[in-house]
Structures are given as C-alpha cells and as structure tokens.
C-alpha cells in the first residue's frame, strides 16, 4: 500500500498521473523522461544521479522538473549541458574538460568568462541578476 502511494505521489509530482495507464512505448520522449524520474523518486533515494534529465523536455517541463528535484531535500548529482539551468538550480557546480574537473564551486564562483573560455573555448560576458541567476552573453 505504501509503495502504491509513493508511486502515485511521484507521478503526480511529475504531472504524469493521468497517463499512468498508457503504455510506456506510447509516451513522447519528454513524457518518458518524466516517468523515469517518477520511478526513481518512488524508491525514496537519499542520492539521486541524473544524466541530462532535461533532454527532450519543453522549457516549462525543464523548469518544473529541476524545481521538483531542487526541492527534494536529498543530494542530487546531475549532468547538465545548459549552463544557465545548472546555475539556476544548483548550489555547487563542477566544470569538466576531457574527463577532468577543472573548476568547482558555487555557480557565481565557477561560471566566469575565464572558466567558459578555458572549458568551452568561447568568449563571453557573465553578469548576475539580483536573485543570483547567470546571464551569459557569448561574444
């Protein structure tokens, strides 16, 4: 009974409860992504590992999913290629190049024109909003 309640709660969080009776193969890529997250959440993990969890998701669902994950009260290690989303939803970042961590720290400490040049080979200007969101302008 508890397991059913956990699954139901996870599906509701991911806005997938109404599609619970559909075959997995009939879901869109984004819906499949949300079901997989719901499945992981139903296991009540203490550590959640996510590899590109926002792939195939519309912007609204990217924001919804990352907001849910941030509010879980568990440790999350997520691989994200969208720097601005990573800054918005992370307390701590690792920037990697060729499999090595080359920068780490808070988003504001980590995301700088120098780090973006070193890791991605791009020139940029980075400014921060009052609510600590990165605004990156690539030159």
List where the protein language model places each region.
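Catalytic Walker B motif of ABC-type/P-loop ATPase nucleotide-binding domains
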Residues: 48-52
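ABC ATPase nucleotide-binding domains
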Residues: 113-139
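Conserved ABC ATPase signature
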Residues: 23-27, 31
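Hydrophobic anchor residue at the start of the ABC signature
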Residues: 37-38, 65
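Conserved ABC ATPase "signature" region
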Residues: 2-19
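A short, proline-enriched helix->beta-strand linker immediately N-terminal to the Walker B motif
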Residues: 42-46
